[in-house]
A protein has these predicted regions:
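Nucleotide and nucleotide-moiety/phosphate-recognizing core
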Residues: 2-149
Length: 149
């Protein structure tokens, strides 16, 4: 079974403080003079009609790029889980897929593995061979009440 693109909202998580990067908004990083977030957005377009950015600053800049940004519902930069919660609250689709804005190497293989499912699930998370990478997730919207912070 494959999940249809009409059933997925994809949210690129860019709402952090970026303390390890001196406060630079990771969503606005560039490689070869191209914004990473636009690169990710362009890949996401193949897998969903509903693509958003979760950001807590520079919302006007994202808008100028043609992106729609959702600010965290919870205040004070509470981390990626707050972005996931905001995404589940705002999404109108059955599934929400999240990925971080600072992962430019994500490719079509990742998306295909996440949406080509052969069993029922509530949440799927990527695994890099050593650890689970929970910000790379596909979550049923039904889990929203379980996540309430």
């Amino acid at each position: 079974m494959k999940i249809n693109k009409e059933d997925i909202t994809i949210v690129i998580l860019a709402g952090g403080k970026s303390e390890r990067m001196g406060g630079q908004d990771k969503g606005l990083l560039q490689i070869n003079k191209k914004y990473i977030i636009k690169h990710l957005y362009n890949i996401c377009k193949e897998y969903s009609n509903e693509i958003y950015v979760n950001a807590n600053r520079n919302l006007a800049t994202y808008s100028e790029m043609g992106l729609i940004a959702w600010k965290d519902i919870l205040e004070n930069y509470q981390g990626p889980l707050a972005g996931m919660y905001t995404s589940l609250m705002n999404a109108k689709t059955k599934y929400v897929m999240t990925l971080p804005c600072d992962g430019p190497l994500v490719n079509h293989i990742y998306f295909k593995r996440m949406i080509d499912i052969n069993s029922d699930f509530d949440i799927r998370a990527a695994h890099d061979g050593d650890r689970i990478q929970p910000v790379y997730s596909l979550i049923k919207k039904d889990l929203l009440n379980n996540l309430k912070l």
